[in-house]
């Protein structure tokens, strides 16, 4: 059995108009994230992790922010595209672990809904998807509520 690990990281700055979209769901918050696409920092980190595991570069290579076709793009569509590339190479998701780093908004009320979206988009069981959140104890840009950072790790197995 061939196994591949991918790590993804993404950051977006607060300041855009609502909605705030995280993990494919709308999270109530007074501002959105500034981005070329819909700004879903969670799905961007996961997409990067999948592309990394497959040695296919990153989301900037596949969906450049200089391309007007991706202006306001739905990050769920981008994630499904990245996962299809992996499936076309004969791989499927074994498990996913995501860490959302944000002082605000509070993520706990939204984690199960995000897990359900991810399980659907990645054709996986919800028990193979973990999403957790942490703060930086008011330190750094996330602690000052200037933005959100996300790390994602995927384990992909050859089908």
From Swiss-Prot:
Function: Involved in the biosynthesis of isopentenyl diphosphate (IPP) and dimethylallyl diphosphate (DMAPP), two major building blocks of isoprenoid compounds. Catalyzes the conversion of 4-diphosphocytidyl-2-C-methyl-D-erythritol 2-phosphate (CDP-ME2P) to 2-C-methyl-D-erythritol 2,4-cyclodiphosphate (ME-CPP) with a corresponding release of cytidine 5-monophosphate (CMP).
UniProt cofactor(s): a divalent metal cation
Enzyme superclass (EC): lyase
Binding site for 4-CDP-2-C-methyl-D-erythritol 2-phosphate: 10-12, 36-37, 58-60, 63-67, 102-108, 134-137, 141, 144
A single GO BP: isopentenyl diphosphate biosynthetic process, methylerythritol 4-phosphate pathway
Entry-linked InterPro entries: MECDP_synthase (IPR003526), MECDP_synthase_CS (IPR020555), MECDP_synthase_sf (IPR036571)
Name of the protein this chain belongs to: 2-C-methyl-D-erythritol 2,4-cyclodiphosphate synthase
Binding, a divalent metal cation: 10, 12, 44
């Amino acid at each position: 059995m061939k196994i591949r690990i991918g790590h993804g990281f993404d950051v977006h700055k607060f300041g855009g108009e609502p909605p705030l979209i995280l993990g494919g769901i709308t999270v109530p918050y007074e501002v959105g994230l500034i981005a070329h696409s819909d700004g879903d920092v969670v799905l961007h980190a996961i997409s990067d992790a999948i592309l990394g595991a497959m040695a296919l570069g990153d989301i900037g290579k596949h969906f450049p922010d200089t391309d007007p076709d991706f202006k306001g793009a739905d990050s769920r569509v981008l994630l499904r595209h990245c996962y299809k590339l992996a499936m076309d190479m004969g791989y499927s998701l074994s498990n996913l672990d995501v860490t959302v780093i944000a002082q605000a908004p509070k993520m706990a009320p939204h984690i199960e809904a995000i897990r359900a979206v991810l399980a659907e988009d990645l054709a996986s069981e919800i028990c193979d998807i973990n999403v957790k959140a942490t703060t930086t104890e008011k330190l750094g840009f996330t602690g000052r509520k200037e933005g959100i950072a996300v790390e994602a790790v995927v384990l992909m197995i050859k089908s």
